[in-house]
Amino acid sequence: VTHRHEPRGASGRAERAVAEPIRGAVENGRVRRPSRDGLTIEQAAAIESPREFRLSPDGRRVAFTAEAAGARQIFLMPVRGGYPEQLTATEKPASDPQWSPDGRRIAFVCDEAIWMIEVEGSHQALVTQHPAGNRSPRWCTDGHQIAFISRRRGWDQLWVVDAPVPRRGRPATRPRSAEPAALTKTGVDIDDYVWSPDGRQIAATSQRLPDLLTSQIHIVDVATGQQRLIAGEVSWETGPRWLPDGSGLLMITDEDGWFQVVRVSVEGNERTALTTGRREHGEPGGGWGYVPLPSPDGKRFVCVEIHDGLVDLLVGEMACATGTDPLRAGESGSAVVSPFEGIWMAVGWLPDSSAILAIGSSDRQPDDLWLLPMPEAIAEGAKPRKLTRSLPTVVDTAHFAVGTRIAFEARDGLVVEGTLYLPASAVGEEATRVPCVIHSHGGPTHQALRDWLPFRQLVAEAGMAFLSVDFRGSTGYGREFRWANRGEWGHTDAFDVIDAAHWAAAQTWCDGRLAHYGASYGGYMTLCVLAEEPSLWRAGIDLYGDSDIAESYRHGDRPGRIDLERMMGKPDDPEAAPAYRRGSPLYRVERIEAPLLILHGRKDKRVSPLMTEKIVEALEIEGKHYQVHWYDDEPHGLKKRENGRDAWKRCLDFLRRHVLEQVDED
């Protein structure tokens, strides 16, 4: 569903002084088009990496999800090489595959229900389902129970259910699913959890009202449901993983202002730092792939180190009674096991602790699975081995734009960093000046990583620079920077983005034509910066962003509402209300000058479609130049390949028309 509006008798774009382009940028009155040999939208949409890799208990196979016939299915593949075997055949997407301890079964999620399937046979059984949804299935270490998270009582509670018994012959009737039991009480949302090696306890992460500035870890007794706090009283602590012998856990904490890996006792009264320094060794969500993993022999651990928009994988010794020095940020070259600069996430250790299974990507390579040897093996000549190949042969990445780190001082003196991607036409002896697309990431508690993002390459292929900005509030720069936009949404963080645009316009490679692009919080930033400094922009693209954050608090889903409350307080609080109003671009629509493209999914629960409906109504009233397109079958984000392809085309066409001012040669 598409709607266009162009003001009568006006171009919808304010006049701007544009730097004179270097000779060669314009030929015969037309903007020179990029080479036809570059990446196409069709190629970019066809690149689909496997996801959600899970290593089998014996280390011989890996389960993962990949698209097949329009839905993601679970596949199995030998770690040492071989052709993938499709395990599931479901109409709805399958996700989150989890091996049973004996390696004979896999639990997974499909259509918000928990299912189990036998690895060597066709038997598939329903574990549990509920209209409120179910997620995160995890096997008890004895294989007799499966825990999961469900909102069936209105909160993200931990539940436990008996696992279906492996098939022994064909049953005469369809067995009835066991009834699950709640393990944690209502009133608390569980974010993540992990079983202890003996199956008697669970370490669970949660954020508990009214304190939203800490993340806590509790040990839950499976038999009684009693909980014991071991971490997070005064800091953000998450990502717990049990040591193999059950004597303690690894986790990440920002106690010193940066996310570090620590070893903590089961009682929580003893801690040992395993990393140190001014770099992040985890992220606030404690997300899969970013948590520290102890080796099976208990002697080592693997963790991430985030810097300069990159994520390295480090291996360190388990510091305990030996007094081994912790890994120090920026000085751990010999401990880095990731083979190239990019974004790395640990999947798991081989059972003999000899290697790590990991996912690696970069701005030139999509996600692929790798087997990474230990540092001593690398010193003896062992090499990392790539197990999957997601990039089609027809796609030549040699000409792809590669990120360059930049930094500038914001108007209040804060140093803000980002990553710049220049098109080929802006590099070399015959370089021409080019426009620049400023990109704000989502979150905002996130950062713009130098990972596989086809749209930035498509922008570069079209002849425009692409500058991703880590405005205040981004992760990767320590706690002080991460909290720097508390109470400041749409204000000082928007100033950072505007200052980045001014920095870009002053560079010799830029011709002064600027656009802003972003999704989710980045889409919200589009509206904010276009309203804050209208004459700066040639175009803006808003993908499912907020327009009125007070109304978003009232109409969005619970996780989004809690995030807003953490960062801005409650909109009905008289002290917070002015900041909510200031941070809502809906009330400044009359200031917007640049043409605006808005894309949104009708099933979005995080950013309610009401946000786009309200901004479109205001744009219509003010007679602004805009286009809006709705995806009737999409939630927050564009999940379907065909919709992603359509969105890329709409965005590029919009930029070509309003920034490049290209004339259709046909």
Model regions and ranges:
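Cap/lid segment of the alpha/beta-hydrolase catalytic domain
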Residues: 390-507, 511-512, 519-520, 554-555
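Short linear segments in intrinsically disordered or otherwise low-structure-confidence regions
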Residues: 5, 9-14
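Extracellular/periplasmic ectodomains of large secreted or surface enzymes and adhesion receptors
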Residues: 12-13, 21-41, 45, 272-298, ...
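Conserved beta-propeller blade repeats
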Residues: 46-63, 89-109, 131-149, 155, ...
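Active-site-proximal cap/loop segments of hydrolase catalytic domains
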Residues: 471-666
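Flexible loop/turn segments at secondary-structure boundaries
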Residues: 211-212, 237, 258-259, 281-282, ...
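Conserved beta-strand positions that form and line the central face of beta-propeller blades
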Residues: 43, 86-87, 125-127, 179-183, ...
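Beta-propeller blade-edge and WD-like acidic-aromatic loop motif
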Residues: 3, 21-39, 61, 65-86, ...
